[in-house]
Amino acid sequence: MNWRRLMNRPTDFSKQGYPVFDISCTPVITKSSSAKFMAPSPDAMNFIATVGDDLIYLSSPYTSGGTVDGDEAINRVESTKKMLFTLMNMGIAVFSPIVSGTGINPYGEDKGHSWWMHWDLKMLRKCDRVAVLALPDWQDSLGIQMELELATILQKPIFIIKEGE
């Protein structure tokens, strides 16, 4: 499928009624040591049981209204890294195009949105499920809209993940 066709199919995915999981972990200190570990919330445990060994595509917004705001983009990347680490720490196999892309972008010239979406959508095809990190204004992200459209066409299960407190 040509990714450009996905851009011309606007759908309001915020009203689709996807399952929502509040992924939060609580720091726990054991009696036998001062070491802390993160105990997953009941909702996080339900998410683990739901996805099993599936490979998750973690979709998250990078731009705001189609433009990159430097500080906001940095905050979104950091929030995505935190969620990526949380999910991996819970034993979930997960891929994040934002973390992957921002990690390698300094090694070449800026390729632009269409170049990145080409590779992101290739990776989405390889994943079993799509989870959207519900950062502010995620519904307005063109990239997320395209990812959800392709996931819907491919009949991949879609989840919304809220950042835990």
Regions found by a protein language model. Give the residues of each.
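Conserved catalytic or regulatory cores that recognize and/or transform ribose-phosphate-containing ligands
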Residues: 2-165
